[in-house]
């Protein structure tokens, strides 16, 4: 009898704990009544990786498998383009940026291209074989000027159209899984294993290393509109950097949804909405600083992981996989 009573008590305790825990963890969030995004099928198995525009109408999209597309209507439609590259090399075009009519493309392995006529013609620039790492991020800075960052945190700048490059750091950060640049020229990166992040400010010669704030490995990191940082860790954890200039002051973990898929990128829209994108069509938005979240109904229907947001003054895109792309059209969908 005592054994039976003990078993019943244990079962009741398990049920109580289960109910209690289910109130702390949400497996679903409400679905928004409308979406500002429109799905575009690029009809390719390549992954779109970056977008940049010469003006509000004309721009380019680049991606894996040498993919380059051109638009003349703000990104509603994309047409195939090609680059004069060796057929035997399957380049991954990872970054593109324009300043007016001058544009740059960075790719892997060892690819850098330059245009001075709005992308109608591209010239390949051959990089020094001693360049640390592979090109990862290119930023157009003005006439004949650009900044190149590699996947080991080396940063180089040119002021002569890419004929020569000057190193900005004396010691690279090591292999990175994510690297972002702010509008003022600062950089932040996540180490290849996700066990620490590093920051670099213009004028400094080395990266500053910072340990992660929890046992969860870091996935990605970037800049909020006010210059503070955001962080995404494994386990679908979001943290926001609250300190004024203190890059080690982080909020408690925000876990909007536990659907088994992590987040890969974040972005802020012009109205202050916070967007998080990730695996299996996960696309969430918060309109109250991260306190509550909604699922985007268009993103939820896409058979793709969302890997990156691209926002500029006139456009916004969510980049997926296998030709999946979302374009911002406003709250009309």
Swiss-Prot record:
One GO term describing the cellular component: plasma membrane-derived thylakoid membrane
Leader sequence segment: 1-23
InterPro entries: PSII_CF48-like_dom, WD40/YVTN_repeat-like_dom_sf, Ycf48/Hcf136
Membrane topology: Lipid-anchor
Predominant location: membrane
Matching SUPFAM superfamilies: Oligoxyloglucan reducing end-specific cellobiohydrolase
Subcellular location: Cellular thylakoid membrane
PROSITE patterns linked to this entry: PROKAR_LIPOPROTEIN
Lipid modification (S-diacylglycerol cysteine), residues: 24
Keywords: Lipoprotein, Membrane, Palmitate, Photosynthesis, Photosystem II, Signal, Thylakoid
Biological process, per Gene Ontology: photosynthesis
Lipidation (N-palmitoyl cysteine): 24
Highest taxon, organism lineage: Bacteria
Protein family membership: Belongs to the Ycf48 family.
Its job: A factor required for optimal assembly of photosystem II (PSII), acting in the early stages of PSII assembly. Also plays a role in replacement of photodamaged D1 (psbA). Assists YidC in synthesis of chlorophyll-binding proteins.
Domain commentary: A 7-bladed beta-propeller torus, about 55 by 55 Angstroms, with a depth of about 25 Angstroms and a central pore.
Quaternary data: Part of early PSII assembly complexes which includes D1 (psbA) and PsbI; not found in mature PSII. Binds to the lumenal side of PSII complexes. Interacts with YidC.
Record's protein name: Photosystem II assembly lipoprotein Ycf48
Native source species: Synechococcus sp. (strain CC9902)
